[in-house]
Amino acid sequence: MKKLLFLISISLLSCQSPNKSNSYLDYSERSDKLSGGVKIIPINTPIGKFNVWTKRIGNNPAKKVLLLHGGPGANHEYFQAIESFFPKESIEFYYYDQLGSEFSDKPKDESLWTIARFVDEVEQVRQALKLNKENFIILGHSWGGILGLEYAFKYQNNLKALIISNMVPSIPDYIDYANNVLAPKLDPEVLKRIREYESVEDYSNTEYLSLIENHYYPKHVLRMPLENWPNPLLRSLTNTNKDIYVRMQGPSEFGVVGDAVLKEWDRKNDLKKLKIPILTIGGEYDTMDPKQMEWMSKEVQNGSYLHCPNGSHWSMYDDQENYFNGVTGFIKALP
């Protein structure tokens, strides 16, 4: 009899445990259940209404992370490594393709590609997803870090926390670091050839692209042989909206050139205005100065810094354990 009662109790526990552990993936009470977490959000812009694509993973009423991809003009795909880390910590997160990016509408009007308009878009996305200061966390990588910062300057009262990944608060400083710190580390002959192509603005030349891809990218963008770059990242790069990228960032990989929208962007003097918890992340071999990313964490009122000693611009891939242990630790420590 005792043995029977013991077996019954074990059976009951085994039936109950999955309900508790699977609540993270229980979409039964969510309005996006039919679409598996996908929500298409209409966005009002100065030239009309367009749709942007989002997809939710998981349930956590207190920790909801909106992912802001880089580029500008890239897409959510390279964030897919997060699926190896956030679910096991029960962190709810949202993929989101910004207007002009892969799964979202792609209007051609260049007047849309401004920082202020993208900030307004993020606020409309927040409202549509019903995120608020009790649960709303932004993780912005590269250009997404600029967008996250700018959103926080205008709407920090809507945020629980902000994570700025692999981005500095000044494009002029980024340009200086690329040209005067990283470029001289290249083989002199390689750098000479790169500069020759850039001097005549021949950025699409196959040799120029080959020099960048074989000598610069594996050192500072992702420290892996090109043939080993992960598929989600390759898909994201392949599907990048080049029109947005060139309009905002410019065609050069050594900073921002020409009349690109971001060329003069600098927010160093405004960092002290930010009160929310902020994590900045820098890679030792990044295209941007990790020391400035650390400095940024000290300028804001409630900042912390995560250094990835093996990481480059995509530290989430080439220093993955350090990166995600730090990110999930920061999120879990939030009230």
Descriptions of predicted regions:
Residues 268-310:
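Conserved loop-alpha-helix segment in the C-terminal half of the alpha/beta-hydrolase fold
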Residues 189-272, 276:
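Alpha/beta-hydrolase
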Residues 162-203:
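Flexible "cap/lid" loop of the alpha/beta hydrolase fold
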Residues 117-135:
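Conserved acidic catalytic loop of the alpha/beta-hydrolase fold
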Residues 134-178:
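Conserved hydrolase catalytic core segment
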Residues 303-335:
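Catalytic active-site module of serine/aspartate enzymes centered on a nucleophile-bearing elbow/loop
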Residues 86-106:
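Conserved alpha/beta-hydrolase
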Residues 73-84:
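The serine-hydrolase catalytic nucleophile loop
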